[in-house]
Amino acid sequence: MANRVYCTYFDHRYLSRGLALYHSLRRHAPGSRLWVLCLTDECYRTLASLDLPDLIPRRLAEFEAADPEVAATRPTRSALEYYFTCSPAWMLFVLKCELSAEWVTYLDGDLFFFESPDAIFRELEGSAVAIIPHRYTAKNSRRLRFGIYNVGWVGARNDPDGIEAVTWWRAKCVEWCHDYVDGDRFADQGYLNSFPSRFRRVKIIENIGANLAPWNIGKYRIDFRDDRVMIDTTCPLIFFHFQGLKRGLGWFIFNNHRVYRAPFSGDVRKHVYKPYVDELLAIESSIGPILQVSDVKPHRRSAVIDLGQYLAGMARGLRNRVFQLLDMMTGRVFLVLRGTAY
């Protein structure tokens, strides 16, 4: 798998998730390398001290020195917007470093692999760019304004066609990359909409086992058979996107299925979420003496720009608190006691 290289980024607050991604790749894609853009010095120092095989950490300062155009956007963008701006530039950085790699694939830090990605790469034969649709349920169709495709998996073959797409994407994110919808633009993600018509050899990944997530899980039947999570009976789960998973109210870990009006079955709780939560807790326990990361929180959203956005944010916060209480009442949460999830 040495010709397949992955890259991601996260800070020390996301460290347990990033390491869970790494360990799942080690199990299911042995020999592949994971490059990590460390968004804080604490993150870099921890990863450097762990010295894990096939994990290549890089300081944010090193990346910015190599791409001053991206670094120049930092004062004009929120932390989250700046991280989004870095996505294609980080891919391009890794493509230039990994000249022998066949594919360089960007992964969001909150992905977790349950099976080998070989089935995905079989789809990509002859392709130079790989993108994956959100596959929103009908209940979430209004979210298409955020993009047809999800930036959680974006792959580029290390050839002129792949590099052309990533280079264009980087330039567009330098030009504009904000955490709100502006026409057909949204963060780093909206630009993916034009990939199929703009570039050659673009493959839209069809395997429904790739990027199962709260926003699309309601479309499928999820079962557990023969030690595998199966989607619609015949397709094994390759990787899940644990977007929105977070701690709250001290001892609880919440998911955001209710935000997407998505089901949360016993099989999903036991065979999808529980293994991931257990991995996070094990990682936090093992690296606790190095860095305390037990209170993992998502990156802050963009700064408030008007009263409407402020009020909308207040409404979201109230809604989320109500959802948390409902989840506690209906068994959708994990209670964490002494490092064990129940």
Give short role names for the model-derived ranges:
Residues 35-36, 105-106, 131, 203-207, ...:
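A structural signal for short, well-ordered beta-strand segments and their strand-loop junctions
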Residues 84-136, 155-156:
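GT-A fold catalytic core of metal-dependent nucleotide-sugar glycosyltransferases
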Residues 121-175:
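Conserved catalytic core of nucleotide-sugar-dependent glycosyltransferases
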